[in-house]
């Protein structure tokens, strides 16, 4: 009897213990699920940040190029007074979908309001507690070229590149936010509206809030609601993350890890996104073995080039593929081509290593008929390669000398500088997206390319970009045309082992010259592109190819006639570099005919 009584007394205790264990097990399962499905930010999305010498979080010098800090302070004081004296506030009505996007949970809903000081937010209180996000606005004296200078000392020979400060809110003082609402400046259609620093600042404030203080769903996405006539910057807020659009309201659900990666990089091209050389000097390359050892391949990636309208770059594309394979890359090589490339040459391109994909050309509606750049917008087809998460585009007049796989760790748009705040589109890191392709195509009749080609156009679409070292896409030119510049660059072209990652051949291409010397020397207007050292480097790659591929680099009779005519003119005008005196031994000087 005593034993039965004890068992009966213990039964409720065991039942309670079992219930407690089940609850604990369920909680542990939920926690494990959340961790398991959290996208890894250590390899694909954020590994690029480990190379940054001065990131968005750290670049805070006291002087903006040519602008005294005192002037900025005074200007910002004026901005504050303007805000305080704003008498007529705009009554801001919420979008119709406001209720459905707010997830009600424990505690009061918190809504962060950015750049809303001049708005009447009375009606918003029914949705939750509105929190004004305070930050100091950039001065009107702060110009785009301060963030995107034409030149920086990449090798740090005389100075260490730094970026001017863009003020941000005090994030540590803020609580978690259920929603970030942003009033985005839009000065369209004023000239230069895309490169307004305040526009960039507000986009960055929104991105930082979403990444650092935004509550996330099970997909680790936060919510950002923009109010603007202009679309938020697609360089920061991808159009793929646009969930709803209603009048001037834009609802985004960005992936937090993607935002974190972008925010880890310098705020402009004022510093390198990828410093390849150690502080000891340009000859000491960073040891990347640890990064490469830790790197997995969670995404599909490829190198891509494009051929269209003629076969004049077939030889260049063959040589490019061979140079990439010599770097031991394991990424796919994709070649986009139109119907202008013959079957014979397509077979040669495939034999060189390219996987072929046919495209339909895209015409620039503002180009003159039959002009050289009439179909240069065909390059936009790159964004339709959506079976790849990331691609690196490389022009067919480039050879690669060192492995470039590291660039896959960097976001769109990463490239090398060209002129002023413009990047060079010869090598670009791209994230394919049908949505982005549609955005690019939709503005063809509106955007006027400064150079009539894809480079000028893309620089108006992606104005916020990340500077890669010029040695990643080393241009074969000598703009100052000084002996010092020529000596430095020619030494880099000839260095063994290679000190540049890729050489971009401007002017007459190597396969359109005799192999004996760079034929740019024969034309006065082309002298800025002339380099025998770079010429020899290209032919070294060519000579390593199979004979069956080399024959596609033969000269046409027409081109041979042009070369001989230019040599004759150089002799008649007494060109003092005397390249016209060089005895031509190139066997292609006789066997000059078209293949296929």
Curated annotation (Swiss-Prot):
Entries under SUPFAM superfamilies matching the protein: Nucleotide-diphospho-sugar transferases
UniProt site positions, description: Important for catalytic activity: 379
Record keyword Membrane present: yes
Keyword Transmembrane helix attributed: yes
CDD domains on file: GT8_Glycogenin
Broad class of the protein's primary localization: Golgi
Compartment list: Golgi apparatus membrane
EC numbers: 2.4.1.-
InterPro entries: Glyco_trans_8, GNT1/Glycosyltrans_8, Nucleotide-diphossugar_trans
Gene Ontology CC entries for this record: Golgi apparatus; Golgi membrane
Protein family: Belongs to the glycosyltransferase 8 family. Glycogenin subfamily.
Cited function: Glycosyltransferase required for the addition of both glucuronic acid and 4-O-methylglucuronic acid branches to xylan in stem cell walls. In association with GUX1, is responsible for almost all of the substitutions of the xylan backbone in stem glucuronoxylan.
Protein name: UDP-glucuronate:xylan alpha-glucuronosyltransferase 2
Organism listed in the record: Arabidopsis thaliana
Lineage of the species this protein comes from: Eukaryota, Viridiplantae, Streptophyta, Embryophyta, Tracheophyta
